[in-house]
């Protein structure tokens, strides 16, 4: 299994229940397709660098996971057709140095905080 990271941004107009439902939906897509989720990092609502689909803010999530390569096409398809996702990025960690960084990121985040809370980023004017 390969090491991956997916970052996705949800619309800021969603309620907390809808955000949690979309996060669970993405996690379900991963687990149903034999992925092992290492860490989920909710990064909170942040101002975007530029408008995306008329939105200036978005709710960010990062998921570190291990998965077979055939899962990525399905994950991309699901994220593209999900209206609430305004942008996403999937990163594959390939060489030993990158995998070591992935391990450090996924386990370091997990061990440093028992429950990860969203970051309150100050709004930039």
Swiss-Prot record:
* Cross-referenced InterPro entries: Ribosomal_bS6 (IPR000529), Ribosomal_bS6_sf (IPR035980), Ribosomal_S6_plastid/chlpt (IPR020814), Transl_elong_EF1B/ribsomal_bS6 (IPR014717)
Q: List the disulfide bonds.
A: none
Q: Does the keyword section mention Ribosomal protein?
A: yes
Record keywords, A-Z: Ribonucleoprotein, Ribosomal protein, RNA-binding, rRNA-binding
Q: Name one GO cellular component term.
A: cytosolic small ribosomal subunit
GO MF, one annotated term:
structural constituent of ribosome
A Pfam family for this UniProt protein?
Ribosomal_S6
Q: Do the record's keywords include RNA-binding? A: yes
What biological process terms from GO does the record include? translation
Q: Which family does it belong to?
A: Belongs to the bacterial ribosomal protein bS6 family.
Q: What does this protein do?
A: Binds together with bS18 to 16S ribosomal RNA.
This chain's protein is named Small ribosomal subunit protein bS6
The organism named in the record is: Campylobacter jejuni (strain RM1221)
In the record, what lineage is assigned to the organism producing the protein? Answer: Bacteria, Pseudomonadati, Campylobacterota, Epsilonproteobacteria, Campylobacterales
Quote the gene name from the UniProt entry. rpsF
